[in-house]
Amino acid sequence: VLFRVGIADVVPKSIAYHLLAPAMALSAPVRIVCREDKLERLLAEMAIQRLDLVLADSPMPSEIDVKGVSHKLGECGISFFATPKLAALHGQDFPRALQHAPMLVPGEHAMVRGRLMRWFGEQQIQPRIVGEFDDSALMKAFGQSGIGIFIAPTVIADEVRRQFGVEVSGRTDDVTERFYAISVERRLTHPGVVAVTDAARQEMFAKADNR
């Protein structure tokens, strides 16, 4: 079974992997083809049947003239990560400790960026933003070096800690990351698409959505 997936560049790589892994466990052999790009370009590819599914952090944009259906996979809060040295300086009294702390944030195309900045405003916190990144993996690499505190979906917090040698300095459910599968089908029939959507809702995001 050929499974062609477009991944919006703002979706964390680890999230994309966990969402797609169930498709590789199907009884029928699956050959997966992953393409990463801006959401608009991926939707254009899907419109001419070059992709079976697009993973995104937002539903189908209303201003794009492409036939597509958004299927919400789930949502979760965010966690803040820092090296042990940085966490020792800014890890106490969360979230007040983020005041003037060096912060790495997602680029302006990521939906969570706006939610995060609004939350800072509501908390009357002004971190010192030292970097903005469209690529979440690059943001984590900078964070691993101790340049600043960064965020990631809480659902992958343990994995981020292990992989990058960082600590969780705080977390909130007031800022959420949301993930969607966009397809041309309202009624899902492609076995890979069905596997991805079912596993996300029943396993990966089940606890987060029921918090």
Q: What is each PLM-predicted segment?
A:
Residues V1-S62:
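Central regulatory/effector-binding core of bacterial HTH transcription factors
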Residues V10, D37, A110, R186-R187:
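Short, surface-exposed acidic/glycine-rich loop or hinge patches that mediate macromolecular interfaces
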Residues I15, L89, E167-R211:
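A late-sequence structural motif
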Residues D57, A88-H90, A101-Q123, T189-T197, ...:
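Secondary-structure junction motif
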Residues E63-C76, A137-L188:
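Beta-alpha-beta core module
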Residues G68-G107:
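Flexible hinge/capping segments at coil-to-helix
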